Amino acid sequence: MRRIGAFGGSTALWALLAAHVAGAFEPVSVGIAIGAVSALTGYLSYTDFYCRFTECCHEERPLNTSALKLDLEEKLFGQHLATEVILKALTGFRNNKNSKKPLTLSLHGWAGTGKNFISQIVAENLYPKGLKSNFVHLFVSTLHFPHEQKIKVYQDQLQKWIRGNVSACGSSVFIFDEMDKLHPGIIDAIKPFLDYYEQVDGISYRRAIFIFLSNAGGDLITKTALDFWRAGRKREEIQLKDLEPVLSVGVFNNKHSGLWHSGLIDKNLIDYFIPFLPLEYKHVKMCVRAEMRARGAAVDEDVVTSVADEMTFFPKDEKIYSDKGCKTVQSRLDFH
């Protein structure tokens, strides 16, 4: 309130001074000049002033690539493919002012491997409020689309929600969690918004971002990771080309993927299928350390080892990968 009062006072003072100065010149000319300057100043400063007090949609604000890269490298563990592809995809999309379609990413892997976490990182790098932003929209299948008999209702509601929010902010972000629990057919309602149209009913969707999160394909990803491990090869040697084709076909043919026989895949509207590899023992320890730092506690390696040792690993013989990733690290750390 003090800032607004100060602003009002300074405006009144400026008007008073302008009136005194105007008295020394020809009234009409000075009046026009003052009016023009006032209009220009108001036009240039109003938006910045307004956005100090409320969240604004900055569609053309450049992405801080260095900050995103640092966040991905320091906060996401064991996911070299996801880090590389997300950074490349977001940077390229935001730097391209003439994108032909919205950016559409499909993230796949077992629970606890970092899919939700990376969507949070992306949201925070696009909008300071992250997932709490008015321009970031999170849908959870079991919460927002629970009933199979209401598919048509959900499709209509989804279209209206996306249409309304993109018309308000062209660079809105839409995140769909638990795609593997989404009833097939619902997601096809947004197909027109993801296609190569300049506009749909007068609205352009070309600056929007759509992110799908799914456990579907986790078995295919794990098989590839295991094959590399058993061949004595490092997981960092796994490339996107080793997994993306298998993922897209596997998800398309999986009745429990939410993208089963979806036009989004059939029409190649998903830009990247991003695999999240199963996490190893060393990655779980990294998660524990990160959680301890986030809580403001000193890292105790005995506690780190103790928490990691409590996790269960698979396959039965090799015991390489955590079956819950880092998902239960927070709750387990509470008991130490």
UniProtKB/Swiss-Prot annotation:
GO terms for biological process: chaperone cofactor-dependent protein refolding; endoplasmic reticulum organization; nuclear membrane organization. Its EC number is 3.6.4.-. Coiled coil: none annotated. One of its GO terms (cellular component) is endoplasmic reticulum lumen. Residues 1-24 form the signal peptide. It comes from the Eukaryota. Keywords: ATP-binding, Chaperone, Endoplasmic reticulum, Glycoprotein, Hydrolase, Membrane, Nucleotide-binding, Nucleus, Signal. GO terms for molecular function: ATP binding; ATP hydrolysis activity; identical protein binding. Glycans are attached at N64, N165. Highly expressed in liver and muscle; lower expression levels are observed in brain (at protein level). It is found in: Endoplasmic reticulum lumen; Nucleus membrane. N-glycosylated. It is an enzyme of class 3 (hydrolase). It holds the Pfam family TOR1A_C. ATP binds at G109, W110, A111, G112, T113, G114, K115, N116. It catalyses: ATP + H2O = ADP + phosphate + H(+). Homohexamer. Interacts with TOR1A; the interaction may be specific of neural tissues. Interacts with TOR1AIP1; TOR1AIP1 is required for TOR1B location on the nuclear membrane. Interacts (ATP-bound) with TOR1AIP2; important for endoplasmic reticulum integrity. PANTHER family: TORSIN, TORSIN-1B. Belongs to the ClpA/ClpB family. Torsin subfamily. May serve as a molecular chaperone assisting in the proper folding of secreted and/or membrane proteins. Plays a role in non-neural cells nuclear envelope and endoplasmic reticulum integrity. May have a redundant function with TOR1A in non-neural tissues. This is Torsin-1B. It comes from Mus musculus. The lineage of its organism: Eukaryota, Metazoa, Chordata, Craniata, Vertebrata. The gene is Tor1b.
